[in-house]
Amino acid sequence: MRKRQAKKRPLLPDPKFNDQLVTRFVNMMMWDGKKSVAFKIFYDAIAIVDEKKQDEEKTGLEIWKDALSNVMPHVEVRSRRVGGATFQIPMQIRPDRKVSTAMKWLISFSRKRNEKSMAGKLAAEVLAAAKEEGAAVKKRVDTHKMAEANKAFSHFRF
């Protein structure tokens, strides 16, 4: 194990929107170190969101941020062994973990969609999540239901 926790390295903001959150998302979406490909997919997806949006006063990036906040879980369950039995204990999530979990879900459920390109898949999932629907939002709802169902075990906190 480490002697001390590793320092968080600062992320460079992305070139188009000058936003660190976008860079974090692109880094998670990137495969095989192909960052330029991941950036192209993200920017194309935001352009598609801009075309298909119903809300005229919001930009594609704002819709993406709304979608991200709609997917963010507030509680999660963690396994803990107590006297031979394993309990699912509901726990609050740290703010940085909320964001990274939401990003992971948005990316993974985008990849499972049936659109032609990854940009199309991501755009469709972002638009769905912004409207409080889609697989990523369903995952958040299921996680919250699981935490609610196991509320009785919350006194076993870590």
From Swiss-Prot:
Record's function text: One of the primary rRNA binding proteins, it binds directly to 16S rRNA where it nucleates assembly of the head domain of the 30S subunit. Is located at the subunit interface close to the decoding center, probably blocks exit of the E-site tRNA.
Family membership noted in the UniProt record: Belongs to the universal ribosomal protein uS7 family.
GO molecular function: rRNA binding; structural constituent of ribosome; tRNA binding
Keywords: Ribonucleoprotein, Ribosomal protein, RNA-binding, rRNA-binding, tRNA-binding
One biological process term in Gene Ontology: translation
Designated name of the protein: Small ribosomal subunit protein uS7
Signal sequence region: none
NCBIfam families the record matches: rpsG_bact (TIGR01029)
Alphabetized SUPFAM superfamilies for the sequence: Ribosomal protein S7
CDD domains listed in its UniProt record: uS7_Bacteria
GO cellular component terms listed in the entry, alphabetical order: small ribosomal subunit
Pfam families, per database record: Ribosomal_S7
Subunit structure: Part of the 30S ribosomal subunit. Contacts proteins S9 and S11.
